Amino acid sequence: MRAGHALVLFSGGQDSTTCLAWALERFERVETIGFDYGQRHHVELEARTAVLAALRGRFPAWSARLGDDHMVDLAVLGQISDTALTRDTAIQMTEAGLPNTFVPGRNLLFFQLAAAVGYRRGLHTLVGGMCETDFSGYPDCRDDTLKALQVALSLGMGQRFTIETPLMWIDKAETWEMARQLGGDELVQLIVEDTHTCYHGVRGALHAWGHGCGECPACALRRAGHERWTAQHTA
């Protein structure tokens, strides 16, 4: 275990749950932060509560290191963002080559606010679930963006901050495998049953890969990754 404290950007989805488990294996104390920005899939905020409770109940060693959860009201982001994540509109590609689920500046703002909380609480490692492999092309998920942001935050705060992105260079199948290696089949099942990824907020029938509509970009990535992981894991 690494000495020190970390703050995890935690949405209640598969990726951030895996990153939270990763942090709990590595740091003496871990806190979480979430954001309510009027997202259409608001059910993810309920999922994050369920996931935190399940982690505390099923993983005693992690529970001892899991500290406070911080929820930030970012309604203003929803007010200035006309996207399929904050409006009841169909998901489609834009002329810029990005899906209209892209909320401009979202991750930049998330990390800035996380750093402000971390500054106050002595949490100088910020952990996020961004990646450049199985992703929708969002520019604020790119490694170069986050490295530049790490420098800007450290300069602007007058303290050294580190941004950790454990999933940056692995695909969704490898993300499922990371979860299994961190917490065994119990963590995998927790992710299937309790986390939420679907952009449409569907919590109906439980699929092998979890809840969701099965059609939106988030569900498609999660489903395909689970199928590849299952094929590899059972081969």
Swiss-Prot record:
Cofactor requirements of the protein: Zn(2+)
Top-level EC class: ligase
Catalytically driven reaction(s): 7-carboxy-7-deazaguanine + NH4(+) + ATP = 7-cyano-7-deazaguanine + ADP + phosphate + H2O + H(+)
Keyword ATP-binding carried by entry: yes
Cofactor note: Binds 1 zinc ion per subunit.
Enzyme Commission number(s): 6.3.4.20
Annotated GO biological process: queuosine biosynthetic process
Binding site for Zn(2+): 198, 213, 216, 219
Residues annotated to bind ATP: 10-20
Cleaved signal peptide residues: none
Pathway annotation from the record: Purine metabolism; 7-cyano-7-deazaguanine biosynthesis
Gene3D superfamilies: HUPs (3.40.50.620)
Membrane-crossing segments per the record: none
Domain of life from the UniProt record: Bacteria
Alphabetized UniProt keyword annotations: ATP-binding, Ligase, Metal-binding, Nucleotide-binding, Queuosine biosynthesis, Zinc
Family the entry assigns: Belongs to the QueC family.
Protein purpose: Catalyzes the ATP-dependent conversion of 7-carboxy-7-deazaguanine (CDG) to 7-cyano-7-deazaguanine (preQ(0)).
Entries under PANTHER family matching the protein: 7-CYANO-7-DEAZAGUANINE SYNTHASE
Protein name as catalogued: 7-cyano-7-deazaguanine synthase
Name of encoding gene: queC
